[in-house]
Amino acid sequence: MRPSLLQYLKLLLLLALGGVTTMHVPKQDVPSSLEELTLDGHFSFHDVSAAAQDFGNLSSFPPVAVLHPGSVADIATTIRHVFLMGEHSTLTVAARGHGHSLYGQSQAAEGIIISMESLQSNTMRVNPGVSPYVDASGGELWINVLHETLKYGLAPKSWTDYLHLTVGGTLSNAGVSGQTFRHGPQISNVNELEIVTGRGDVITCSPEQNSDLFHAALGGLGQFGVITRARIPLEPAPKMVRWLRVLYLDFTSFTEDQEMLISAEKTFDYIEGFVIINRTGILNNWRSSFNPQDPVRSSQFESDGKVLFCLEMTKNFNPDEADVMEQEVNTLLSQLRYMPSSLFHTDVTYIEFLDRVHSSEMKLRAKGMWEVPHPWLNIIIPRSMIHKFAKEVFGKILKDSNNGPILLYPVNKSRWDNRTSVVIPDEEVFYLVAFLSSALGPHNIKHTLDLNYRIIEFSDKAGIGVKQYLPNYTTEQEWQSHFGARWDTFQQRKKAYDPLAILAPGQRIFQKASASLPLPS
């Protein structure tokens, strides 16, 4: 059996027996010494059920305690205390932001959860000088960062699609969206970090100071420390956004047009693609938010039974520059090979566009459709393999499926800092592909996980060279394969910054170490 498929088979077996995976481990005594720590915040020992859940809603690993830090010192004190307990203690620590992990990565079975959102305070500081930046807590939500920086007419350059995530959470992974082709992921847009390591040391780091820890933590899956503060560079924020969508029937034209746009000097400010399978009335659905360029022809378009490819783009502008924006957009559109009847557009404020997923969230919450299992699969595919992948996955594996959005868009490797811990293909252009399924009931979860299994199995056998984003592995062999030649560096950094493997146990990369280590002075 191929090791890269084990986690899916385990989940399939468990779900066939009845639903969400819950880990029950022998209950260790709550270390009474935790109650004796002097803190600005406090521990919770009883009301900890929320910390045993995440957005995936597929795993539940109850902690023994939740720390609600009142300061960075609280986090350092707690981690240092666990470190001093030594190798014989099984206690681990996980930082939990907004809990948007999928398979329990932000959980710590019978360990300590740090509620990072408790660290939100009035410490966010915007420096609007010549090289503007914002200092934000690792527990701050990106939407709050946006609101604060817009007061100065500024904003970060790189975003995620969903802004109700914490700064430390996305920087521990990568942080990608339609701006990534131009600015790189969020981890390529950081000036400085403050980190609490697995020894309990508070360290300020940057590309010039403690650079190894800086690059290790970015995309480091929480393995080397808890990000408690980040300094994010800013740029002037536009007031408005022209938001466009078009459709393609041909995958080759769809991908070639995207690749042309991300390589052009003058292009759109945001570019993402979507794959649409077995969706009826797609253009009619767009009418609630967008205006058709050709109302008559768009009303006659039939999407039933077709695989369609949607290209979504934006152009930023200020109201007094609307005419120039119109000319630039029309010039770019004239170079694309989309179906003319499918052009839809609308003008919205910058914040309305960036916070667009939250608007969808509110609608889904009202229907009870948000807090459901999300067996997502996020992968990165080399450009040279994207057509082979698409032919099998969209033409065969998923031809009868309709479980949720599928994102597919290219980015430029040159915009990613190869010193960070994130793993990407070794080609100048690669594709981010996300299968964002929602599942209701054990049967639907099992069906979706089975499709994920088939996608990964095909990719392995066909030599696609897939790398998982938000990776979900369970064995050291799988992680070694994921990191490849970078595994030795990742291990060495772990030994340097978290030698007892206290941090982020939910990633299932390292077991808590057993080593003879000098205690910190």
Swiss-Prot record:
Belongs to the oxygen-dependent FAD-linked oxidoreductase family. Expressed in inflorescence meristems. This is Cytokinin dehydrogenase 9. Residues 59-237 form the FAD-binding PCMH-type domain. It holds the Pfam family FAD_binding_4. It is found in: Secreted, Extracellular space; Cytoplasm, Cytosol; Nucleus. The keyword Oxidoreductase applies. Its cofactor is FAD. It is an enzyme of class 1 (oxidoreductase). Keywords: Cytoplasm, FAD, Flavoprotein, Glycoprotein, Nucleus, Oxidoreductase, Secreted, Signal. Its main location: secreted. Gene3D superfamilies: 3.30.465.10, FAD-linked oxidases, C-terminal domain, Uridine Diphospho-n-acetylenolpyruvylglucosamine Reductase, domain 2. The keyword Glycoprotein applies.
